Swiss-Prot record:
The entry's keywords: Ribonucleoprotein, Ribosomal protein
Listed name of the protein: Large ribosomal subunit protein bL27
HAMAP family: Ribosomal_bL27
BP GO annotations: translation
Pfam families: Ribosomal_L27
GO CC, alphabetical: cytosolic large ribosomal subunit
SUPFAM superfamilies in alphabetical order: Ribosomal L27 protein-like
Organism per entry: Persephonella marina (strain DSM 14350 / EX-H1)
Protein family per UniProt: Belongs to the bacterial ribosomal protein bL27 family.
Length: 85
């Protein structure tokens, strides 16, 4: 009688490395220009005042200042406001 060892275990058991997405600088934190604020897939959070949007939808600070998360027209927005000196 023909026999074959059961296969299939090699077809499972893979996983990808986590992409370390999410908010990197929180509301009220002081940031420098160029600091990454949010890493995301798609625009879950939109850029506001003094915030740039990268090719991979990364949000980053354009000026030195304080981070502020807001909602505008039902969308989450992150802005950076200059520190009052």
């Amino acid at each position: 009688m023909a026999s074959k060892k059961s296969g299939g275990s090699a077809k499972n058991g893979r996983d990808s490395f986590s992409k370390r997405l999410g908010v990197k600088r929180y509301d009220g934190q002081v940031v420098k220009a160029g600091n990454i604020l949010v890493r995301q897939r798609g625009t879950k959070i939109y850029p506001g005042k003094n915030v740039g949007l990268g090719n991979d939808y990364t949000l980053f600070a354009l000026i030195d200042g304080k981070v502020k998360f807001e909602t505008s027209k039902g969308k989450k927005v992150v802005s950076v406001y200059p520190l009052d000196a």
